[in-house]
Amino acid sequence: MKAIIVLLMVVTSNADRICTGITSSNSPHVVKTATQGEVNVTGVIPLTTTPTKSHFANLKGTKTRGKLCPNCLNCTDLDVALARPMCIGTIPSAKASILHEVRPVTSGCFPIMHDRTKIRQLPNLLRGYENIRLSTHNVINAERAPGGPYRLGTSGSCPNVTSRSGFFATMAWAVPRDNKTATNPLTVEVPYICTKGEDQITVWGFHSDNKTQMKNLYGDSNPQKFTSSANGVTTHYVSQIGGFPNQTEDGGLPQSGRIVVDYMVQKPGKTGTIVYQRGVLLPQKVWCASGRSKVIKGSLPLIGEADCLHEKYGGLNKSKPYYTGEHAKAIGNCPIWVKTPLKLANGTKYRPPAKLLKER
């Protein structure tokens, strides 16, 4: 009677192999069994593939998001996240999102001091949500906020559909109308206004310039202090006065000042607070976001469909259960990374023919 054996590993000169099998004839493949050591098997089946780089693709069976706003032409994802005029549109829902912009990423309207805050993370924060929408109402009345009344500042580099000058829809540049004097820290409460139990992402910031401009705009040329607090996270800033080279955004006039932009995440029903002095950019429209979207670094455009998205190889179709090559983050129905090639071998222990007994 032939014995049934489970073959565990094929021994070759160039690969590790996982094997199973049953008794069969002789073959050049040597396997290691759990109980009988090395035996011969046949029928080796490759289990691994080594991918080649390809275009990123839409993930099969899943809505995949490339740009935050596909219909917002000539807009970076940071433009969309800050709601720059002419960059406001519908963000499609998606279970998977491509992080396609490479640092540093700028936004028009006004020169931003990116390194002072986590503002570069804002587009990626939004990508991590399945559903994202911009509120239709402003979260506070900026013109009548504490320390006002204010007029709302604009930039010639921010034209909108009705005016040659505008500003981000997520913030209001609060410039005192008449009371251009120094002020002690003021506090404004930021209510939760999303209506579907979403996370509320509230964008805010402050403007700073050289001493002359600070005096003209705000009546105070000293560094200003700012604090935000929401969801147990508190952030403090002190503005820089002067020392900025002139910078032009999108063909506008050279600007001597800078803005620092940050955001806070408010959970359902929770109020945030902003403590500020002169030059504050008060929050206006907020992002309401829910669900989860898996984020992976990649590139655009998305071409066709794929089983798996891999940071190094792009779109992959799963032809084998394992792969070798570069190990990196992957999402979807992906093969498993292994260090060396694997193969499945089904074969049998070779039994030499019995010797015939000589007749007497």
Swiss-Prot record:
Pfam families hit by this protein: Hemagglutinin
KW Cell division (keyword) present: no
Note: Major glycoprotein, comprises over 80% of the envelope proteins present in virus particle. The extent of infection into host organism is determined by HA. Influenza viruses bud from the apical surface of polarized epithelial cells (e.g. bronchial epithelial cells) into lumen of lungs and are therefore usually pneumotropic. The reason is that HA is cleaved by tryptase clara which is restricted to lungs. However, HAs of H5 and H7 pantropic avian viruses subtypes can be cleaved by furin and subtilisin-type enzymes, allowing the virus to grow in other organs than lungs.
Gene label: HA
Protein name: Hemagglutinin
Keywords: Disulfide bond, Fusion of virus membrane with host endosomal membrane, Fusion of virus membrane with host membrane, Glycoprotein, Hemagglutinin, Host cell membrane, Host membrane, Host-virus interaction, Lipoprotein, Membrane, Palmitate, Signal, Transmembrane, Viral attachment to host cell, Viral envelope protein, Viral penetration into host cytoplasm, Virion, Virus entry into host cell
Native organism: Influenza B virus (strain B/New York/3/1990)
Record PTM text: In natural infection, inactive HA is matured into HA1 and HA2 outside the cell by one or more trypsin-like, arginine-specific endoprotease secreted by the bronchial epithelial cells. One identified protease that may be involved in this process is secreted in lungs by club cells.
GO molecular function, one term: host cell surface receptor binding
Its job: Binds to sialic acid-containing receptors on the cell surface, bringing about the attachment of the virus particle to the cell. Plays a major role in the determination of host range restriction and virulence. Class I viral fusion protein. Responsible for penetration of the virus into the cell cytoplasm by mediating the fusion of the membrane of the endocytosed virus particle with the endosomal membrane. Low pH in endosomes induce an irreversible conformational change in HA2, releasing the fusion hydrophobic peptide. Several trimers are required to form a competent fusion pore.
Highest classification ranks of the organism: Viruses, Riboviria, Orthornavirae, Negarnaviricota, Polyploviricotina
Intracellular or extracellular location(s): Virion membrane; Host apical cell membrane
Gene3D superfamilies reported for this sequence: 3.90.209.20, Hemagglutinin Chain A, Domain 2
Entry membrane topology: Single-pass type I membrane protein
Signal peptide positions on this chain: 1-15
One cellular-component annotation, GO: viral envelope
